[in-house]
Amino acid sequence: MEKFTRWRDPGTGIAPFHPINTETPSGFNFKWILIVVVMILRVPLCIISVTLWFLWSCFLKPILSIQPKLSFFIDSSLSRLLLLCFGCLKLSKSTSGSFVQGDSLQPGDILAVNHSSPLDVLVLSCLYNCTFAVCDSKTSNVSIISAQAYFWSCFFSPSKLKITDAKPLAKVAAKASKIGTVVILFPEGVCTNGRALCQFTPCFDSAKETDRIFPLYIKYLPPCVTLPVPSLLSFARSVLLTVSFEIRIRFSAEPLIPRNCTDVTESAQEVLSKLGRSRVVKLGKSDKLSYLDARSKKHV
């Protein structure tokens, strides 16, 4: 394990970038038969549902943009179908704290979400009418991206995801308010294995003082469907060898408002950490990029 020391958090000993392997049964037993049967059924269903999602996102959704409620219904239904085909048999959501008058989630609000799997995109698309935004570690500006583009970007190094037409978060939130969507931000900027929260990018620095930020934590059980190391084959293997998995969501009912926070980034990190009952490590996006670079050169 010495070769992993560089990418372990010195304070907690947690390695947030190391993949979690799928547990497979030893020897030949009934569970293997079940896995094979589920795999035979799941492969064609996944192919069909992904194809439908692709056709909808690329061709039909732009046409139905004039009917936002119908568009969201189809988006939500296809996302839920995909999750079901991938093996999600239970999706539960709980709320921490209680809403006060006027504090319920509204168009233009910002969701700060931990990032550990491509499935995060489907989970959020299933629950909310979303505008996804990409965070940059060098600037507080963010760039709008489609749900499908964000999903597929999880299978490539974060360095390949180019930040284009970046805008302050305040402008993105204002645009989302006009079109009736909420802004989805993954402030860590990278995928982890879900064992800890990484350092946040400075994306919240460009938020308006009156913008409302709602932390939301997504947890996968078992955690083998997380994807800290981008690989379509690894993800497919994990999904096919996992008979079923559960998704648990914890949502903070009390929004963070920048003007009420000494440091909104630190406050968001603290609340998200409490929601997920996870530690905050000192590693960040630059550490993830160096880890992937070393891994590609077979240094790990």
From Swiss-Prot:
Keywords: Acyltransferase, Endoplasmic reticulum, Golgi apparatus, Lipid droplet, Lipid metabolism, Membrane, Phospholipid metabolism, Transferase, Transmembrane, Transmembrane helix. It is a single-pass membrane protein. One of its GO terms (molecular function) is 1-acylglycerol-3-phosphate O-acyltransferase activity. One of its GO terms (cellular component) is endoplasmic reticulum membrane. It is an enzyme of class 2 (transferase). Its EC number is 2.3.1.51. It is found in: Lipid droplet; Endoplasmic reticulum membrane; Golgi apparatus membrane. A motif (HXXXXD motif) lies at residues 115-120. It comes from the Eukaryota. It catalyses: a 1-acyl-sn-glycero-3-phosphate + an acyl-CoA = a 1,2-diacyl-sn-glycero-3-phosphate + CoA. Belongs to the 1-acyl-sn-glycerol-3-phosphate acyltransferase family. PANTHER family: LYSOPHOSPHATIDIC ACID:OLEOYL-COA ACYLTRANSFERASE 1 (PTHR23063:SF60), PHOSPHOLIPID ACYLTRANSFERASE (PTHR23063). This is Putative lysophosphatidic acid:oleoyl-CoA acyltransferase. It comes from Schizosaccharomyces pombe (strain 972 / ATCC 24843). The gene is vps66.
